[in-house]
Structures are given as C-alpha cells and as structure tokens.
C-alpha cells in the first residue's frame, strides 16, 4: 500500500487526509 498526500489521491493508495 502506498501513501498518497496529493489532492487527487486515488487508486491503490491511502490518503494522508
């Protein structure tokens, strides 16, 4: 699992917010 912190967080990742 990858951690995405961008506003367009999607796909196989977990948002930081």
UniProtKB/Swiss-Prot annotation:
Disulfide bonds: 4-15, 5-13, 9-16
An annotated Gene Ontology molecular function: toxin activity
GO cellular component, one term: extracellular region
Tissue: Expressed by the venom duct.
Localization of this protein: Secreted
Keyword Isomerase: no
Key words, A-Z: Disulfide bond, Secreted, Toxin
Domain of life assignment: Eukaryota
Family: Belongs to the conotoxin M superfamily.
Domain-level remarks: The cysteine framework is III (CC-C-C-CC).
Protein name per its UniProtKB record: Conotoxin reg3m
């Amino acid at each position: 699992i990858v951690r995405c912190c961008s506003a367009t967080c999607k796909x196989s990742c977990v948002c930081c917010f």
